[in-house]
Amino acid sequence: MSSALRGKRVVNTRALHQACQLDLLLERRGAVPLSYPCIAIEPPEDFGPLDQALRNLVRGSFTWVAFSSANAAHAIATRLETLGMKRTLPAGVLIAAVGPATARAVLDSFGRSPRIIPGRHDGTALAFAMPIKPGETVLAPGSDIARSELTEILGEKGARVTSIVAFRTAAGSGGVDMPLKLRERGVDAITFSSPSAVEGFFERLSRSGLDVASLVRIPVACIGDTTRETAERFGLAAHSASSQSLDGMLDLLEWLFVPVGSGGTAWS
C-alpha cells in the first residue's frame, strides 16, 4: 500500500549518531529524509563525579537507577567499560526508564529490562511511577541540561537522589542547508524527538536571519508531549504521537498527509 509520506521531504533533527535509524524508517515509507542535526551528544567535561557514582553503584550503594533517556543508558554502559568494570548493573538494583526507547537502550546496554516504565514518557511521570520508600537511594544519570522534575519529585517522596551528568547536550552541526530549503519551500515536514532538538533547531536558524514565521505552514511531528509543548512555545504547529516512538511519530506524520475532502489533508 502506498504511503502518504511518499515523496515528502522530512527534516530529521536527531543527533548525527542517531539519525540513521529515523532516516531508514522514513525511506521505507517513501519519504525523503533531510538530515539537519540539531543536537550533539558529548562526554562530560569532568568525569570525576560520574566515575565516583559508578563505583558506588557497583558496590551496591543505590536502590534504584532511573534512566531519563537512551543516551543516559548508553553513556553509563560505555563509561563502565572504560573504567574496566563489567557492563552490567548490580543484580539487586531496581531500574526505571522514562519510555520504551529508553527501556530498549537499557536492555541492549545491560541485558535487563526496567521494572518501571510510566504511561506518559517524561521525568515527572517517571518519578511518580516509581514506588519509592523513604530513605531509598536513586542514581539519576542524565544530560547537563536535564530538567529537574525527576530529582525534585523523588526527593519529595523521601528518596536520596544522586543526580549525575552522564553526557552533555551540545549544539548540532552539518546536514542540509536548512535556511535555503525553507526559502525554496523544499521542506514538507519536520520531526523532533526531544525538547533540546527543538531548541537546537531554532538556535541554528537564528544565525541565518531567516524569518521563522514561515515555519507555521509546515506540519511538525514530535515524540512526547514535552517536546510538542516546547515546539509550540516557538510558534510551531506541532503534534505529538500517541505512541511515543519513532514509528509512532511517523504514523502521526503519515496521518497528517492522508488525503481528505476535495484535495486537502488532515494537516491542511
Mark where each language-model region is.
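Conserved beta-alpha
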Residues: 1-268
